[in-house]
Amino acid sequence: MGGNHSHKPPVFDENEEVNFDHFQILRAIGKGSFGKVCIVQKRDTKKMYAMKYMNKQKCVERDEVRNVFRELQIMQGLEHPFLVNLWYSFQDEEDMFMVVDLLLGGDLRYHLQQNVHFTEGTVKLYICELALALEYLQRYHIIHRDIKPDNILLDEHGHVHITDFNIATVLKGSEKASSMAGTKPYMAPEVFQVYVDGGPGYSYPVDWWSLGVTAYELLRGWRPYEIHSATPIDEILNMFKVERVHYSSTWCEGMVSLLKKLLTKDPESRLSSLRDIQSMTYLADMNWDAVFEKALMPGFVPNKGRLNCDPTFELEEMILESKPLHKKKKRLAKHRSRDSTKDSCPLNGHLQQCLETVRKEFIIFNREKLRRQQGHNGQLSDLDGRIGSQTSSKLQDGRNNNILTHTCPRGCSS
């Protein structure tokens, strides 16, 4: 009785901004550097996505707002087969939300921990796919600065996708980046050098060094240098000076040559463009159009019968999370009712001011709507202009000069 109506997808006004109610929460699957991630289904289209959500108050208290805004500003101008693409961004009183491509194959770190053996053929294809993504980012003046197995997700067929742009930076013209950012074991020598003596700065080659470290680790199970998060910088720089990278005698000559050129300490001599990669004899037989079209099948395909992530994330969300997502609707209704009776506990003035600024400055994005407006051609026709005028002007070496600085003088987002 009435069953027919229950199966009809809800109809949302095309002009209405996408919000939390437009999605059904299915399960928690992970934690990023600035938030948690769950699988969601859009109620009207039934399409599945990953939804990252970040608590506003925690972001303000931890000085993370700028990084969240940076990631949003960069991702709204990008779309590529080997990136995790942004579809929607919106907010409510508690959280900021980013809805992105759902990739259920897990990240490469997870598979390394599961002792997956990656063949040379598989890693060769990964390098090619990631090279296409890095070339695309470089075209729009973006350095990712955190390429590593943790930030490379697999789709169900085993193709790679770069995620996590919260420490990425946009360069203007021929300028170089000058702040130390990244994950130590994957950071290029010139990034550490900038920290020690100012140096000349660094540019796009740092991402290609990180690609080399990642490829080496996938093949061997450990990294070319014994660097950890606690390793002192002077010790790291000394390692680069005196230690030689050891390449397995079982690897083919072409792979060793490719890795050596990616792990060249001098950024001027390092492989750091798609043209450089394509010039390698080892990759002469590669059909690059087929790579771009995902027509070449990777040697490793994730297990479709299991969720390729740590199952404890779901337990944490259900049991340990003080503000679980599945109870949000009821919780917000209760807060709104309490606010209307003036019976709520006010936050301290400075925090309240920061949260209000976050609300005003938050970037709302809807790729589905954008595509409709552009005639369903699937192309972001104004991509170059939007990246150039909006993102580059605001993001200079990771410093977003326009976000929160005018109303939060005590640095809640620095």
From Swiss-Prot:
<keyword id="KW-0723">Serine/threonine-protein kinase</keyword>
<feature type="active site" description="Proton acceptor">
    <location>
        <position position="146"/>
    </location>
</feature>
<dbReference type="InterPro" id="IPR008271">
    <property type="entry name" value="Ser/Thr_kinase_AS"/>
</dbReference>
<keyword id="KW-0547">Nucleotide-binding</keyword>
<feature type="domain" description="Protein kinase">
    <location>
        <begin position="23"/>
        <end position="283"/>
    </location>
</feature>
<keyword id="KW-0479">Metal-binding</keyword>
<keyword id="KW-0460">Magnesium</keyword>
<comment type="similarity">
    <text>Belongs to the protein kinase superfamily. Ser/Thr protein kinase family.</text>
</comment>
<keyword id="KW-0808">Transferase</keyword>
<dbReference type="InterPro" id="IPR000719">
    <property type="entry name" value="Prot_kinase_dom"/>
</dbReference>
<feature type="region of interest" description="Disordered">
    <location>
        <begin position="374"/>
        <end position="400"/>
    </location>
</feature>
<feature type="binding site">
    <location>
        <begin position="29"/>
        <end position="37"/>
    </location>
    <ligand>
        <name>ATP</name>
    </ligand>
</feature>
<keyword id="KW-0418">Kinase</keyword>
<feature type="compositionally biased region" description="Polar residues">
    <location>
        <begin position="388"/>
        <end position="400"/>
    </location>
</feature>
<dbReference type="InterPro" id="IPR011009">
    <property type="entry name" value="Kinase-like_dom_sf"/>
</dbReference>
<dbReference type="Pfam" id="PF00069">
    <property type="entry name" value="Pkinase"/>
</dbReference>
<dbReference type="GO" id="GO:0106310">
    <property type="term" value="F:protein serine kinase activity"/>
</dbReference>
<feature type="binding site">
    <location>
        <position position="52"/>
    </location>
    <ligand>
        <name>ATP</name>
    </ligand>
</feature>
<dbReference type="GO" id="GO:0004674">
    <property type="term" value="F:protein serine/threonine kinase activity"/>
</dbReference>
<dbReference type="InterPro" id="IPR017441">
    <property type="entry name" value="Protein_kinase_ATP_BS"/>
</dbReference>
<keyword id="KW-0067">ATP-binding</keyword>
<protein>
    <recommendedName>
        <fullName>Serine/threonine-protein kinase 32B</fullName>
        <ecNumber>2.7.11.1</ecNumber>
    </recommendedName>
</protein>
<dbReference type="GO" id="GO:0046872">
    <property type="term" value="F:metal ion binding"/>
</dbReference>
<dbReference type="GO" id="GO:0005524">
    <property type="term" value="F:ATP binding"/>
</dbReference>
